[in-house]
A protein has these predicted regions:
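Hydrophobic anchor residue at the start of the ABC signature
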Residues: 80-81
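Conserved ABC ATPase "signature" region
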Residues: 35, 39-62
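Conserved catalytic motifs of ABC-family nucleotide-binding domains
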Residues: 87
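C-terminal coupling/interaction segments
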Residues: 197-242
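Catalytic Walker B motif of ABC-type/P-loop ATPase nucleotide-binding domains
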Residues: 91-94
């Protein structure tokens, strides 16, 4: 390991960091940005390294395009190329796909998985649960406190949530009636359905019993999703900024 005070410079050379906001030079081309980063880190043959990265990330044909003229998805791809150009051992990504379209998000994550398969350790912050599910391990942090960690399956299992999915008529009124009842820890709309969850199964079932036979409603026991767990954990988190 490295001492963060004594070995700060050595650590920096082994860590790649991609900011949420695009931070490369808007008035330089794709190639110029990558060559600049390569020279900054002392990479041998900066031109060759930039050329290889352009090919890897599918940026061929855009080499001379100004970075500021790229779409959000292409900018993120360029930023990923820049922070992995020096071959770091650890890659830090701060909400890397915020504001990026679904297709670009999927392509970006495919590249992240390819890098991880090559041995790169990647630490990602994200508020998209579908992205969290792509990770080997996850951690929930709220207001500076670690609420849960482990694999996705571990985190869901440890939550001990019992969840019902409700479909039918006037779900908004049902949500208002159930919110705050003893045993009901979470009520959240999901598309055309409602998720009702609680950690105490007996208390939850007692709370929803009067509504189970209500005309126009269909109740089904379901496995809690990662988003169910996230919402429930956040509802219990103490806001220490208030």
């Amino acid at each position: 390991g490295y001492d963060i005070r004594r070995d700060a410079d050595r650590i920096k050379r082994r860590v790649g960091y991609m900011t949420q906001r695009f931070s490369l030079y808007q008035d330089l081309s794709v190639r110029e940005n990558l060559e600049f980063v390569a020279r900054l880190y002392g990479v041998r043959d900066p031109r060759g390294a930039a050329r290889d990265m352009i090919k890897r990330l599918g940026l061929t044909g855009r080499e001379e395009q100004l970075a500021g003229e790229l779409s959000g998805g292409w900018k993120q791809r360029l930023a990923l190329g820049a922070c992995t150009l020096p071959n770091p051992q650890l890659l830090l990504l701060d909400e890397p796909t915020a504001g990026v379209d679904p297709k670009a998000r999927r392509e970006f994550w495919n590249e992240i998985h390819a890098l991880a398969a090559e041995g790169l350790t990647v630490l990602v912050s994200t508020h998209y649960m579908d992205e969290a599910e792509r990770c080997h391990e996850i951690a929930y942090i709220a207001y500076g406190h670690l609420l849960a960690h482990g694999t996705v399956d571990d985190v869901i299992a440890k939550s001990a949530l019992t969840t019902y999915t409700v479909t039918g008529d006037d779900l908004n009124a049902l949500a208002i009636e159930l919110t705050g009842k003893p045993g009901v820890d979470m009520v959240a709309p999901f598309g055309t359905s409602l998720h009702v969850s609680g950690r105490d199964k007996s208390a939850l079932e007692a709370a929803i019993a009067p509504y189970r036979d209500r005309q126009g409603l269909h109740w089904q026991h379901s496995e809690p999703s990662l988003e169910d767990v996230f919402i429930e954990l956040m509802s219990r988190a103490k806001d220490n900024f208030q």
